[in-house]
């Protein structure tokens, strides 16, 4: 009898140890649609994975999948449906799905991706959480790239009217409405398609942060850069996790994971974008692209023409049950504080 009990106890202990070992080897599979050298991967997702492993004391590891699982717009559902555990993408790639996230794409928010990203996350937590726009997944973080500017191969842009009828690639979201207001013909394509549409004449130019011009090797396809102080737009990104996978982690592991996500990831991402933009500007000038900045008169007209964007977002926020004016005021105050 004693041998039988001992055997049972041994089996139970062995099973517990096996389960513990299995739990200790939790691996989060990250879907990726960008080259491994892109700042999102090299300077954000991969370092975040190391931070997760360190924060969880090796109990949770992060693995970037070697091949894309779908087009960029599919990545929210790729996480939601459990095809991958973690994904990132652009909110504006799925028009109509998100509304509150457009706040981070409004014109003239600032020149620092780090400041805007942190302020954006804080605003999301404080004002947008109850609207649950990311329902079906665990929202790990939100962030933006640096200020968006105008690049083209046709003519220098000195006044707002110079933009009329130019075919410009835009990434979706609020910049689509902005481009139409300015008389631009918007061309929709994910960023990895930029080289193709510019060299094939599908687009005359592109709206991008400085970083993206050398990265996507489109510097030879462009002649002019128009800098917009505080940015014509930013692009809003999400980092999300399959809800069931998140809930499968222990409470301690969840807390550790979130300690390096949320604001910590927004800071990491924003800082990486700012550094990449600085390097991008150096490359743009070295490539011989003519750089100009809109003067005060052009900026005054631009701000007047684009005032509709804020009003439109405030209406969307109201529809979602959010005090948009309070949220936007808070976000701008945080950006100003963080930019000092």
Where are these regions (language model features)?
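Bacterial N-terminal signal peptides that target proteins for export
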Residues: 1-9
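Polar helix-capping/helix-linker motif
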Residues: 2, 122-123
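C-terminal segment of classical bacterial N-terminal signal peptides
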Residues: 13-23
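N-terminal secretory/targeting leader peptides
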Residues: 23-116, 123, 127-340
């Amino acid at each position: 009898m004693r041998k039988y009990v001992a055997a049972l106890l041994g089996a139970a202990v062995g099973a517990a140890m096996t389960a513990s070992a299995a739990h200790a080897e939790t691996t989060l599979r990250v879907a990726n649609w960008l080259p491994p050298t892109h700042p999102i991967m090299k300077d954000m997702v991969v370092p975040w994975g190391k931070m997760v492993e360190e924060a969880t004391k090796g109990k949770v590891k992060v693995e970037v999948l070697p091949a894309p699982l779908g087009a960029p717009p599919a990545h929210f559902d790729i996480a939601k449906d459990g095809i991958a555990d973690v994904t990132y993408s652009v909110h504006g790639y799925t028009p109509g799905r998100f509304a509150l996230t457009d706040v981070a794409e409004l014109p003239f928010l600032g020149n620092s991706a780090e400041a805007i990203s942190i302020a954006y996350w804080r605003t999301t937590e404080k004002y947008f959480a109850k609207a649950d726009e990311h329902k079906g997944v665990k929202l790990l973080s939100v962030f933006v790239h640096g200020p968006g500017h105008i690049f083209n191969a046709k003519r220098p842009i000195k006044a707002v009217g110079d933009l009329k009828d130019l075919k410009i690639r835009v990434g979706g979201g609020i910049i689509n409405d902005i481009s139409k207001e300015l008389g631009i013909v918007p061309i929709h394509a994910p960023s990895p398609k930029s080289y193709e549409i510019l060299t094939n004449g599908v687009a005359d130019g592109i709206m991008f942060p400085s970083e993206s011009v050398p990265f996507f090797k489109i510097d030879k396809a462009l002649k002019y850069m128009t800098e917009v102080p505080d940015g014509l737009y930013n692009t809003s990104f999400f980092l999300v996790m399959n809800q069931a996978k998140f809930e499968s982690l222990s409470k301690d592991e969840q807390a550790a994971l979130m300690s390096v996500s949320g604001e910590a990831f927004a800071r990491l991402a924003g800082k990486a974008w700012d550094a990449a933009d600085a390097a991008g500007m150096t490359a743009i000038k070295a490539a011989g692209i003519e750089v100009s900045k809109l003067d005060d008169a052009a900026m005054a007209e631009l701000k007047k023409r684009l005032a509709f964007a804020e009003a439109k977002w405030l209406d969307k926020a109201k529809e979602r049950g959010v005090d948009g004016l309070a949220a936007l005021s808070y976000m701008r105050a945080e950006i100003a504080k963080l930019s000092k």
